[in-house]
Amino acid sequence: MSLKPMCVAPEDSACKCCGSTSRLCGVVDFSRCGADHAAGKKVEPYSGVPIYYYRCEQCGFVFTRAFDNWEPEDFARHIYNKDYERHDPDYKGKRPSSNAEMIANSFPEMAQGRMLDFGSGLGLLECELRARGFLEVESYDPYATHTNTSVLSEKYKTVVAFEVFEHHPEPHALMDMMVRFLEEDGAIFFSTLLVTERVLEAGIDKWWYCAPRNGHISFFTSGALATIAHRHGLKAGSFNEGVHFFYRDALPGWATRYSHELWS
């Protein structure tokens, strides 16, 4: 008997970053979430929906095709719903506060220009930054029900995006949205945890960050970041495996005071 009728995912796919051949590298149940990781065991019921991930042979980008046909309403219904905070308990309190503290302490120069928190969710980071003297910061989330659409015609010196890149199914579509907000000498400051060879050798299903119920569906390498940056007229750099930046020509002043690696 042929296994073909049972196949639910092709063995290879074109990379969403560079277009190169990508091979299957792992699978997890859709229900895999932060609550499971926090408990150290499976606490969410299995959904029976397998999420297959591919890894690009060229740039190393890891992605899934499972959500390619989803509309924003689908993400709102199945991921960013009333149960989301249970899967990501830092979402409403700890993370916005710690991110604002990090920016205020390490990159105070950002307060000298207009800032946009892209993918802002409830807008809590804006509140935390304003409380720390960042008075020209605004929020925008393309998937939020009540979002500030007045920013769509504005430009900003710095666009910040914490925990955004791993949530979007199409990296180039995400970049299209973000680049439109940049001033000519503006920069994007963002966080996402890079996927490493060690993670892939151990199995992506063992990696705590691979949690589709949390919306974690796209995972980058430095090569993948350089690829999407180049295609949008930007250069890429990283401070560490979790904090990165895109810029056009001149390195932003706030980046020069810290050790970093440039990928472009």
Question: Language-model segments: what does each one mean?
Answer:
Residues E163, H167:
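A short His-aromatic
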Residues H168-P169, L182-E184:
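Helix-to-beta-strand junctions that scaffold the AdoMet/dcAdoMet cofactor pocket
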Residues L193-R198:
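Short "lid" loop at the C-terminus of a central beta-strand within the Rossmann-like core
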Residues M1-T158, F162, H172-M177, F181, ...:
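Conserved N-terminal segment of class I S-adenosyl-L-methionine
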